[in-house]
Amino acid sequence: MSGSTGERSFADIITSIRYWVIHSITIPSLFIAGWLFVSTGLAYDVFGSPRPNEYFTESRQGIPLITGRFDPLDQLDEFSRSF
């Protein structure tokens, strides 16, 4: 058998009070931060994705669907010009 690395066992860690004091604060905080990030719309701004009301504009009502097998780059250029 190999020697001990000196680390605490997993069972010892999850049964300690210190573990639960730290994680009872950090885990809910992460969920709240994620919810605020999405609900305030900051996620749309950071990642540059369109908001739900911006997918279809007055000038662009069709679905950007590539139908040609041999000229997809031309169709992509046409779609990108409409943005």
From Swiss-Prot:
Cellular component terms (Gene Ontology): chloroplast thylakoid membrane; photosystem II reaction center
PROSITE patterns the record matches: CYTOCHROME_B559 (PS00537)
Keywords in alphabetical order: Chloroplast, Electron transport, Heme, Iron, Membrane, Metal-binding, Photosynthesis, Photosystem II, Plastid, Thylakoid, Transmembrane, Transmembrane helix, Transport
Family assignment from sequence similarity: Belongs to the PsbE/PsbF family.
PANTHER family: CYTOCHROME B559 SUBUNIT ALPHA (PTHR33391:SF13), CYTOCHROME B559 SUBUNIT BETA-RELATED (PTHR33391)
Function: This b-type cytochrome is tightly associated with the reaction center of photosystem II (PSII). PSII is a light-driven water:plastoquinone oxidoreductase that uses light energy to abstract electrons from H(2)O, generating O(2) and a proton gradient subsequently used for ATP formation. It consists of a core antenna complex that captures photons, and an electron transfer chain that converts photonic excitation into a charge separation.
Subunit and interaction comment: Heterodimer of an alpha subunit and a beta subunit. PSII is composed of 1 copy each of membrane proteins PsbA, PsbB, PsbC, PsbD, PsbE, PsbF, PsbH, PsbI, PsbJ, PsbK, PsbL, PsbM, PsbT, PsbX, PsbY, PsbZ, Psb30/Ycf12, at least 3 peripheral proteins of the oxygen-evolving complex and a large number of cofactors. It forms dimeric complexes.
Protein name: Cytochrome b559 subunit alpha
